[in-house]
């Protein structure tokens, strides 16, 4: 009896996912890694390895849930960001590739500094992916990771523990900078910036499954960010750095806010 191989099953998964996502190739690889417990290079190095019926059944269940628009990272409780793997669930946003630019910029700035220890606030930490990525690539940084959601902090705590960073990343359940009593070298944030009125413009899987508290920033979308900008003057050192992810159409208005703060 013919046993289906990794390569054959990979093609089958890819075809099924084409109707669901534009990232069918990435998601196919992620599903295979999840069910086989193999790294991507091992999957491509052993295309003729047979897949067990049990693993096929698990994959089909994943695909069925994906066809219901449930995001894959929530199904497999895992996703990669900045070449690191994070535990994820629907209490936190799924890390996006464009947010890696924020980490790149932070590391560039940190590496240009003369001082050894840098105190960083990661505001709206969610899964902890930004703070953890910085800590893993800048060994002398200390991070205060803040979120209003206790459930998000539970997820962040799990990821921090997975990377043995509990001594370097301190979690706070709080609102923006209100619970911090130190001057900061760097404030970095990926806060909600979607205007409330844009709810129905988002993809179905975002609306149905991702936490709205982490998406919507008020009537304009910038209210929470504006509050952080106002607070930053008190907490940021004179030679410090303020980095935030925003929606490009909001750039001019927020730039004016920063200049005039």
PLM region spans:
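Conserved AdoMet
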Residues: 33-109
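Non-catalytic accessory regions of SAM-dependent methyltransferases
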Residues: 1-36, 40-44, 48-49
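Conserved Class I SAM-dependent methyltransferase catalytic core
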Residues: 219-261
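Mobile active-site "lid"/loop adjacent to the S-adenosyl-L-methionine
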Residues: 193-224
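Residue-level signal for inorganic ion chemistry
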Residues: 31, 69, 99, 130, ...
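Conserved hydrophobic residues forming the short capping helix/wall of the S-adenosyl-L-methionine
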Residues: 17, 110, 160, 232, ...
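Helix-to-beta-strand junctions that scaffold the AdoMet/dcAdoMet cofactor pocket
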Residues: 165, 210, 236-238
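Conserved SAM/SAH cofactor-binding pocket of Class I
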Residues: 100-201, 249
């Amino acid at each position: 009896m013919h046993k289906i191989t990794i390569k054959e099953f990979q093609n089958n998964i890819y075809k099924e996912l084409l109707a669901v996502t534009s990232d069918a190739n990435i998601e196919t690889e992620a599903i295979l890694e999840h069910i086989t417990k193999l790294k991507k290079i091992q999957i491509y190095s052993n295309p003729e390895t047979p897949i067990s019926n049990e693993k096929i059944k698990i994959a089909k269940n994943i695909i069925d849930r994906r066809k219901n628009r449930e995001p894959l990272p929530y199904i497999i409780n895992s996703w990669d960001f900045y070449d690191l793997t994070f535990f994820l669930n629907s209490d936190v946003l799924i890390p996006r590739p464009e947010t890696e630019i924020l980490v790149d910029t932070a590391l560039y700035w940190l590496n240009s500094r003369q001082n050894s220890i840098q105190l960083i606030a990661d505001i709206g930490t969610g899964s902890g992916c930004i703070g953890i990525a910085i800590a893993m690539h800048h060994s002398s940084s200390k991070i205060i990771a803040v979120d209003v959601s206790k459930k998000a902090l539970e997820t962040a705590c799990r990821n921090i523990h997975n990377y043995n960073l509990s001594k370097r990343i301190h979690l706070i359940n709080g609102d923006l900078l209100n619970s911090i009593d130190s001057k900061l070298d760097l404030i970095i944030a990926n806060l909600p910036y979607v205007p409330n009125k844009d709810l129905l413009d988002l993809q179905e899987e975002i609306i149905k499954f991702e936490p709205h508290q982490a998406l919507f920033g008020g009537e304009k979308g910038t209210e929470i960010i504006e509050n952080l900008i106002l607070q930053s003057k008190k907490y940021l050192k004179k030679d410090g750095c303020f980095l935030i992810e925003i929606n490009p159409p909001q750039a001019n208005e927020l730039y004016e806010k920063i200049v005039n703060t």
